[in-house]
Amino acid sequence: MGGTDSKLNFRKAVVQLTTKKTAVEATDDTFWDQFWSESSATISDVFTLIPASEIRALRDENPSNLATLCYKCVEKLHNATLTGCSNPSEQLSILNCVRLLTRFVPYIFEDPDWRGFFWSTVPGQEEESFHGGEETAEARSPLAQTLLSAVADLCFCPEFTVHPPKKTGPDQPEDLSSIDSCEYIWEAGVGFASSPPGNPQFDCSRTELLKLLLTCFSEAMYLPPTAENHSRPNKWLSFFSSAGNRHALPIFTSLLNLVCSYDPLGYGVPYNHLMFADYREPLVEVAAQLLVVLLDHDSMQPTPTTMNGTDAEHSFEEPPVDNLFCNYLSRIHREEDFYFILHGVANLLNNPLIQTYLPNSCKKVSFHQELLVLFWKMCDQNKKFLFYVLKSSDVLDILVPILFHLNDARSDQSRLGLMHIGVFILLLLSGERNFGVRLNKPYSVRVPMDIPVFTGTHADFLVIVFHKIITNGHQRLQPLFDCLLTIIVNVSPYLKSLSMVAANKLLHLLEAFSTPWFLFSNATNHHLVFFLLEIFNNIIQYQFDGNSHLVYAIIRKRNIFHQLANLPTDPATVQKPRRRLASQGSDKDAQASGSEGEEKRPGTSTSAAESLPEMSADMSVKEVRNPASESETSDVEARSPGEATPPSTPGTSRIERKAIGRSASVTSSGSFVATPEWVQSWKQKLPLQTIMRMLQVLVPQVEKICIDKGLTDESEIIKFLQHGTLVGLLPVPHPILIRKYQANSGTQMWFRTYMWGIIYLRNIDPPIWYDTDVKLFEIQRV
C-alpha cells in the first residue's frame, strides 16, 4: 500500500466489504486476498484507510463479513507457522494481516456482544477452509488461542523475526512448531549469553507482532473500573501466560533482555539520533508495555499472593491460574542477572537527566513511566531482587531519576499518576532498613532541577524534593502527604547527619501543619504532625550524635512545640476555621470558577492519566516494630525538604504556608466539624515528651554559653551542640516503627488503570485505541 494505486485498490476493497449487503464466502480467496496481498504496506495506511465509523458499521450491520475477515486473517497467520515465511511477499502478507487485526480488535472489545467472538470455535464452512477438513487440536480450539499461538510462533520465525540457522542441507520450508525458540531469544542477558546481530527489519516485524499482542490483551480497557469486572480472568492473558504457550520462557527473556540491554546513546556520537533511524526504541517501548501487562495478570485473581509470598487466607470457587511470566520473574536469582536488570533499568531512567554542552545532542527516551511500573513489578514479585537493589548504593541510581520526575511533575495535573507510582516505589523501598542506610552517601551529581543548591547527601535531596512537592505541588497531591512523610519516618532512625537545610525545612513543615487553621480544617490533618514529631523523635533517640543542625533548628523553633503542647481546645478557637471557610465561601466559589475556566481553556487537553483514582486512599500499611536493642546506628543522612529560609526572611514561608492551607481547604470535608472533645482526643497523644525533655536540658545551656562567651554566630553554637550529650537524660528509646507497603485490591486496581492509561496515551503511531469507547478511565478531549 505504499503506492497510490495500491492504496486505492485497498480502499476499494474496504468499501466493498463495508457496503455489501450479503455475506462474502470464506472460500472467495480472490476477494479476501486483496486485503493483504498488496506490497509495501504500512500500518499507518491501514489505520488511515479504514475509519472507525466504517468498522462500527461493518460490526453492527454486516457482522458475518467482519467475522470472516478475522477468520481469514487468523488462518493466514496460522498457515504461515506451518510453511514458514521466508519470502518477502509472504512476510508482507503476514504483516498486513497483523495490521488488520490490530485495527479491528479494539472495536470487537468495544461491543459486549462481540467479546466472546474470538473464544468460539471456527464454525461450518470456515472450519473446513481453516483446517483443510482435518480434525486437529486447533480445529477444536477457540480462535483466540489459534491466533495467540500463531503470533507466538511468528515471534521466532527465521528470516522474518530472527536470523535463520546455519543449514548444511537444501533449503526447505520450516515448520515453526519444530523450532526450539529458546535458541532464538532476541537479545543477550538473562538466560541467554550470545547477542544476535541487529536487523532493523526484524525489529520492525517484532514491533508489529507485539503491538497485536498488546491489542489482544487490552480487553480490560473496555470494562468499568470496578472490582467485580476485573476479578474475572482475562482469557487472552490466561492462555498466553499458561503452559499452553510453549514460547512463554523465550518471550519473557526476549522482552526483559530487550528492555534492559537498550542503550539509546549508542556510541555516544553527538546528534547520531538525528542522522540514523532507531528501529530498536519502538520495539523496546512496546516490549516494556507488554511485559508489564503480562506481569499484571493474576494480580487481581480470586486467590492473590501477598507481598511476602504467602497465599491470602480466602477460598474461592475458581482455582488460581499460574502465570508463567510472574513465575519466571520470581525465579531469577543469579547476581549477574540482577546486575544486568538493575543497571539496564537505571541507565534508561537516568537518560533524561543527561547533561551535555551541545543542546539536544543526546537521544532522550520517554518511556520512563513504563520503566517505573516494571521496576515496581520486579521488586514486588522477586524479593531477592529487592534485597539486591538495596544491598549497595546502586539503589541511588533509581532514587535520583524518581525524584527528578516527581519534582518535574508536581504541578502538572495530567501527571498525577506518575507522582503516585514514584512515591509508592519509594514507600516500598523505605520499608527496608538498607534504604535508609544508603541515603547517607554524599550527593555529588547535579541534576537540572528547580531546587536550591545544597551540599549534603541523597537524604537531603529526598527531603528537599518532598518539601517542594508538599509546599509547591498541585492541590490534588494532598492525599500523598501521608505517604511522603511515612517514607521520611521509615528512614529517620538511620539519618546520621542532617544538613541545616534539611533541618530548617522539616521544621518549616511542622510550623505549617501545626497551625490551628490547618489542624482543625480536616479530620486527618493532625496525622501529619504526628509523622513529623515521630521523625524528630527517631533522630533524637537514635542519631543524636551528628545531628546538631536539627537540634539547633528545634531550639530556634521551640515555640512551635510549646504551642502544640498548649494547643487551645475551647469551642471558639476550634470552630474558627469553619466559620472562616463559611464566610469566604462565596469568594472561593468565584475564584474557583475563574481558575477552572483558565485551567480548561481551549487548546488544552486532559490526559487519560488525569482521571485515575487516588492511590493513597486505598493504601494498606503494615506496621513493623523493631526492638530498640536491634536498632543499629546506620550510615544514613536525611535530606532537607527545601532551601534554608532564615527566620528574618519569612516571605517564602508565608507563600508556602498559603499553599499548604489552600490544599487543606480544598480537601476539607463539608460535613466535618471539629469539636473540643475531638481535639483533646489526639492532643493528649502528641509524642512531645522526648523533644520537651531535650529542650529542657539544652536551651539553658545554649543561652548560658551565648551570654558567657558572647556568641552570635550560629556555627559556634552548632559546634557546642556537637560535643553535647543527652545520655541518661532522655526517656527510654521507643521501638522503631516501620510502616511497610502491603498490596490490596484498591492499589492493584489503581495500578491496572494507570498501566493501561499509559499504554493508551503512548500508542499514538498508530493510534490503536483512539476514538474507541474506553471504559476503564475517562478520556477528555478539547
Language-model segment annotations:
Residues 1-117, 678-685, 689-697, 701-712, ...:
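N-terminal alpha-helical scaffolding segments that mark the starts
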Residues 3, 37-38, 48, 79, ...:
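Ordered, helix-dominated protein-protein interaction surfaces in large eukaryotic regulatory proteins
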Residues 4-9, 177-179, 183, 394-398, ...:
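Compositionally biased, low-hydrophobicity segments enriched in charged and small polar residues
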Residues 13-14, 31-35, 46, 73, ...:
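Generic structural signal of hydrophobic/aromatic residues within well-ordered alpha-helices
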Residues 17-20, 55, 132-133, 137, ...:
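Intrinsically disordered, low-complexity boundary segments flanking structured domains
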Residues 23-26, 30, 49-56, 354-361, ...:
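Short, mixed-charge, low-aromatic patches
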Residues 37, 88-91, 95, 102-449:
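Alpha-helical repeat/alpha-solenoid scaffolds of the HEAT/ARM/MIF4G superfamily
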Residues 400-403, 410-782:
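Eukaryotic scaffolding regions of large macromolecular assemblies
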